[in-house]
């Protein structure tokens, strides 16, 4: 990666008023550190969901928090509605009671789980369908209890977490 070329291009875009912030997608912390020598990175768009929580465990999201980099989550619903895995079966069982408790649906619980993370992750819902956008907005109204957050995470992991 030629950081000088990228930095020059971004500086030019900022000077022309074309962009206000600069973000990257799927960058590992080492890539961000390299590029950050020349330019402020404001966002990193990564795959993150209950189906793929590894960025929360491998230090990626911690790195974002330490360096004041916003996290955007693509594929925030993960494979929950696509694959009938043991993990998803355990989560569905938990959701039976949580859907009732929060008067919502599984899609919104998946988004609320992401939104509850203290790093203020922004899910990218990836739809242009009005009904789905309105439904996703309802997830912002859910104040997921921390115990429920951990019960969802533990269901995905298949074990208690400390």
Where are the predicted features?
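Beta/alpha (TIM)-barrel catalytic core signal, keyed to glycine-rich beta->alpha loops juxtaposed to Asp/Glu
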Residues: 1-162
């Amino acid at each position: 990666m030629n950081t000088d070329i990228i930095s020059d291009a971004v500086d030019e875009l900022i000077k022309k008023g074309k962009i206000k912030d600069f973000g990257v997608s799927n960058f590992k912390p080492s890539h961000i550190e390299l590029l950050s020598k020349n330019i402020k990175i404001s966002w990193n768009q990564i795959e993150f969901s209950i189906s793929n929580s590894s960025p929360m465990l491998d230090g990626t999201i911690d790195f974002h928090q330490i360096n004041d980099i916003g996290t955007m989550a693509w594929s925030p619903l993960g494979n929950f509605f696509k694959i009938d895995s043991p993990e998803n079966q355990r989560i569905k069982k938990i959701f039976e009671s949580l859907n009732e408790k929060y008067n919502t649906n599984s899609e919104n619980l998946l988004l609320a789980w992401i939104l509850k993370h203290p790093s203020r992750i922004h899910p990218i819902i990836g739809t242009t369908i009005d009904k789905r956008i309105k439904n996703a907005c309802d997830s912002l109204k859910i104040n997921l209890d921390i115990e429920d957050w951990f019960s969802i995470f533990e269901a995905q992991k298949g074990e208690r977490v400390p």
